[in-house]
Structure formats: C-alpha cells, structure tokens
Amino acid sequence: MDRAQVQIPAEQLARQRDFETKIRDMHAQRPLRAMVDTFGCQQNVADSQHIMGMLEAMGCTFTDDPAQADVVVLNTCAIRDHAEKRVYGNLGALTHTKKANPQQVICLCGCMAQRPEVAEKVRQSYRHVDLVFGPQALWKFPELLYQVYTQRRRVFSVADEHGSIAEGMPVVREGRTRAWVSIMYGCNNFCSYCIVHYVRGRERSRDPERIIDEVRGLVAEGFKEITLLGQNVNSYGKDLGIGYDFADLLAALDQIEGDSLIRFMSSQPKDASHKLFDVMAASRHVARQLHLPVQSGCDRVLRAMNRPYDVEKYLELIAYARRVMPELVLTSDVIIGFPGETEAEAMETVALVEKVRFDALFTFIFSPRPGTPAARLPDPVPREEKQKWFDRLCAVQNGISEELHRQYVGQTLRCLVDGVSDDARWQLTARTAGGRLVHCTGDKNAVGEYRNVKITDSNTWALFGEVE
C-alpha cells in the first residue's frame, strides 16, 4: 500500500482541529457534556482515548450518566454476537434520554459501525442515532460532528476504505499508570472466522520514529506501563519496506531510559520469531509476558480457520520462548466448536492445553460473524454439545491456573499498584511484571507506584497479598 495514501496529510488533520474550535465556540455559553462508552478490545480503549481528546478540545466535560450528556458516543465491537446485542440494548435505552433531551447527539462508532448491514439497521430502526462512523473515519470525528450540528441531519461515514494513519490526534489518558500506544492498524491474515480485517482494513504500520517519540514522551510523563497495540504486532513493519520489524522496534524502545515496563498485544504465531524472543530476553524494560493465540490444538481445524501454522510449529515457538525466558508468563486464546469440529478434535485442543500449561486462557465458543467464510460452513453440532467441550476445557485450564498461582504464595513480587480493588476484602489491585492480577492490602497512596507485595494466598484467577 502506498505510504502517501495511508498517511493523512497534516493540513487535513489541522482542519479537524479547526472544527473542534468551531464546536467549542458554538457552545461557549454552556459547554457540552459528553459520555464515551467503550466495548471490546484494548484497541477500542485507545481509540476512545482519542475520541475523548477530541471532545475535550471541543470544550466538553465528561459524565458517566447518559441522561446528563449532550453527546453520547458508543465505541463498539463486532468480534462476537453477544457484544453486538449489548450495543443494540444500549442504543434502545438511549431513546429515553433522547426524548428527554432532543438536542442530545448520539454517535455509534467502532468496528460494529463499519459493517454496512449494521449501519443500515441503525438508519432504519434506530432513528434517534445521529452519527455513525467506522474506525477508518475516527480521525475526522470533529468534522462529522460539526455536520450534525450545522446541517441538522443524520451523518453516516462508513465508506469501504483500506484505512489510514492519522498522527497527532488529541488524547485523554486517565492517570499516569498505564498508556496504550497503537503501533499499527488493520490485519492481513483473513482468519476464516474473523471480521476484523473487513472492518479495520489492511495492515498499516506507523513510522518507528513516531512511536519511539510517543513512548519517550509517556515515560517522561511518568507512565509506568506502556502497552503496544496492533491486531498483529508481530507483522509490524512489513509494509514500511525498510527492513525494520517488531523485534527491531522493541529493541529501540528498550533503550529509552526510565522506570517503565513495555507490554504488547496481540500476536500471531505465524509471525512470531526467535529474534523477537531473544530481544525480549535481553531487554531491561520489556515484560516477560506473551499472549500468543493458538485457537485450536487440531491441525485440520487450524487449516479450516485459515491459521497458517500447525501445532508442531506452535509448540516449537513456545519451547524456544520458555528456554530463553524461564520466567515467561504465557496466555492464549482458544475457540471451541468451530464449524465441523468433532469431539475428538476438540479434545486435541484440551490435550494441547494440558501439555503447554498456559498461565491463563481466554476461551470462547464459536460465534458466527456474518460475511466471514466460517459463517457459511455447515455446523451440525448442537450448542449444548459444544458447551460440554467448553466446560471440559475450562475445568482443565482452571486447574492449571490454580496450581501455577499456588507456587507464588510466600514470595515477594514487585508489582504495579494500579487501583482500588472491587473485592471488599482488599484495598488495592496490582499487576506483577508478568501481568498477574494481585488483590492486596495497603495504603491507597501506593496507587500508580511499583511496590513489593508479599503473596499470602491465591486462587484460579488471582494472587492475594500485602504491600510491604
């Protein structure tokens, strides 16, 4: 893809800043209040932070109450049917706030909004929604919102575009603990069950200098953890044409002085390499944490999923990563019940989980996405049967996670204290360098700081301890 076509010109981005000023001036007598509700992955979280940055530049303050908001933004996820149903439920509930405040502007954006059938459904059945735009139009949100205000009409911007890169968009990040940094956008993998490449476009890598400058700035601001984001970070740089890959980027970021930890997600096994693992092992600031989705432990199912690796390749990668990083925390994704999968094939996945012994596993029953090849495959196995396979898989993984967590009891771990615990028995939540959740007692002044935590107990999902 031509880089000149991918990069949004500076003058077009400056034009968006002008629209932000115009909207702020339009509402100077009573500044707008906005609510941004985010569904889905960390990339959506990062996108929402840019949306909030643009809204803040428009003079907005923020609220969590849609009834108090002049602008409501739902940033949506299309990865599973359940996520879409939640969004439609929320859209339905907003009819009441719109009725109470007819001037309220309701915006639908994100991956779900990029799907033409969704945009048409919203156009016909959710007439209180004023603005619909996909991920490719995120950078021109101020212009689209300005059109809603000045032209008094509904605006839809879901054109079928390859995607772009917009640098320098405003951003609002909460606190100084964690920051998300997108290093690339889109996906070229075309897994047969996945809709991401249809709604996020083809792969586009940001220039490494831009990423390095952004991370250096975040470290200087005091952020303790920085997570690099992409649909497949391991393919970073392929489109740049300069012989620069993700391992090179990690090595460069590791040279930034400071007390910050670098994480990354998500990864594709086909692009993972020994070079990447060697860079991680030699680094000072890169977490010994790897999320490497395997999706299935059956080679036939992997081929049907259009995942271009086999179980042997996956196991070789894991063996090498663990050899150079014995302390590695390994997590993965698994889909159970892919169309045509048999019980014996599902049990191959269970066997792989038993062999690899992941620290944690994100497990899902297959959810057909309209427009994907997998959605057209015959799927004769009843949901109830798939649920049994799923429960078996979860039982195995839960036992492994509980056992692995138990080995930390009695140890003292350096953790980043990141907030107040939802569990009434504990004051704080923290994360180990490997990303393990820790509920702990301690002074709330520790939030945002690295502290040593003495681990006193554990269960399947978390560690428990005391801040020293």
Regions found by a protein language model. Name each.
Residues 37, 196, 229-231, 265-267, ...:
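Generic beta-strand/beta-sheet core signal
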Residues 174-177, 187-189, 286, 296, ...:
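Short flexible coil/turn linkers enriched for glycine and charged/polar residues
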Residues 1-236, 275, 290, 312-323, ...:
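Proteins enriched for Cys/Gly/acidic motifs involved in redox and nucleic-acid/cofactor modification
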Residues 78-79, 200-201, 240-243, 303-309, ...:
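Short glycine-enriched, charge-decorated loop/helix-capping segments at active-site entrances
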Residues 191, 211, 228, 264, ...:
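Conserved, mostly hydrophobic/aromatic
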Residues 106-108, 115-117, 220-348, 354:
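Conserved SAM/AdoMet-binding glycine-rich loop
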Residues 1-3, 19, 376-468:
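Terminal RNA-binding accessory module
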